[in-house]
Regions:
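Arg/Lys-rich, alpha-helical DNA-contact motif
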Residues: 2-6, 11, 15, 25, ...
Length: 101
């Protein structure tokens, strides 16, 4: 059984995030989100991209970062989250090993 995947158009993404089309285009140009399709009229966004767009806009607004800096900040935030998950996994493994000895 296959899962149904829903996509949002550029119009739907701007309505749901209250972000202008120009801003979404700038975010896409920086690679912060990567919709399907070659041109804005063809773009299709996966639902999790809504949260990424909103996070990018908050960083841009609150920290007054340009879009390139926002892209870097989001990449670093994601890397820190991954490192924390890895650290937690390794701690659990170490705890199991300590119990065995």
């Amino acid at each position: 059984m296959s899962e149904t995947v829903y996509y949002l158009t550029l119009s739907e993404i701007t309505q749901s995030t209250h972000v202008s089309e120009d801003t979404v285009v700038a975010i896409v140009e920086q690679g912060i989100v990567q919709p399907r399709g070659k041109r804005p009229a063809e773009w299709r966004f996966e639902p999790p991209m809504v949260a990424t767009l909103q996070r990018a806009c908050r960083l841009h607004r609150d920290l007054e970062l340009d879009w390139a800096a926002v892209a870097l900040a989001l990449e670093l935030i994601e890397e820190v989250q991954q490192l924390r998950q890895d650290n937690e996994r390794l701690r659990r493994q170490l705890a199991c090993l300590m119990e065995l000895s």
